Amino acid sequence: TLRQFEEADNFGSLIRPDVTDVDGMLKNLESKNVSGHLFLSETHKKVLQALRQADYLSPKYHVVIANPPYMGGKGMNPTLSDYVKRKFPLGKADLMTCFMSSWGMSNNKNGLAAFVTLDSWMFLSSYAKLRQSLLSRNSIISMAHIGWNCFPEGHTYNRGVTFITKSLSNSDQGIFIQLSDVPATVEKDSLFLERKSSKDCRYTKTSRDFLDLPDYILPFWLSAQMMSAFRENIPISEVSEIRVGLDTGDNERFIRFASEVSRNNIIFSAKSKENVEKSCCRWVPHAKGGEYRKWYGNLLEVLAFSPADYRVLSNQGNKLPSRQYYFKEGFFYTRVSSSKASFRYLPCGSIFNSAAPTALDRKSVV
């Protein structure tokens, strides 16, 4: 225990004492009178100080409330980085999630833990195992997803969240309030009180509900029907593979509307670049995202893909990633859109752009 506090200024309250009966040891040592021992007196004081610190940090509390520090791995010194990787592997990406691992998931049974954090841990894939552990053993009984303007400093911090967990069970209903869907300048304290009383943007979920979602993410606003869809259906990732398309680095040279070139110079049925070469055609159908449209369409452009064009594209732009998937059947969507998600059929013989990520049937992918 004494060695643990050698880095107390660095690790702070992330230290979890190895001693189990701190209180008993303290009482025993405090009863000792070593004032007459020249060499023992100072050591006795240091041991008592370390044990008192250990007592403060032992997992004995029924309620823990914390606004932990926000620091990603890049901001940690080597000693601290090594410590959190060893002690808190699920939360090592940020100090705030290390504190969640340390205090939020190890306090007394039926204890409560309340935190103010950023919301990155709710959605990023790097926190998937942390979420799984938290949701499997605890109930989030209350959460306010604040978003911008969550601290008195104003709009400095984005995506804040405050939540309370209860240990032992993950089947208790929790109340979630959405405050992040408004402009950054809106005062969140008054909005919270308004939505709390009106029950607008207020949702109920159990922690167990989120365990059915990909990577155990926490989109608490999803409807019961949407949650059921995730629970009862096969994920697209199990039957298809989503790939990023190409960037030409010079769209004016390599991309045209199909109406701008001769139809006789477009090959619609290519299965490989060799087919393009044999056809003596320069252009192939090209999926480039486009406006909101469901199921079919937005196949208005063609791409220059002759052998000469292929050599140039192999060395500029993003250098033809996913080229082994070109000309295969699939479905694509627009990467950046202000509208709802929409998916469209990509026929065989087409090449997809980076603006149109494409899902391909795993069985057809060689």
What residue ranges belong to the model's regions?
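Short intrinsically disordered, low-complexity coil segments enriched in acidic
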Residues: 1-6, 291, 350-351, 356, ...
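Class I S-adenosyl-L-methionine-dependent methyltransferase module
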Residues: 1-59, 63
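Short, flexible segments with low predicted structural confidence
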Residues: 35-36, 341-343
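Signature of N6-adenine DNA methyltransferases within the class I
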Residues: 55-273, 298, 309-316, 328, ...
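Anionic group-transfer/hydrolysis microenvironments
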Residues: 69, 290, 336
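Short beta-turn/strand-loop junction motif enriched in small, turn-promoting residues
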Residues: 148-149, 292, 338
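Contiguous C-terminal substrate-recognition/catalytic subdomains in enzyme active sites
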Residues: 261-262, 271-324, 332
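Short Ser/Thr-interspersed hydrophobic loop/turn segments at strand-loop and sheet-helix junctions
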Residues: 287, 324-342, 351-352, 362-366
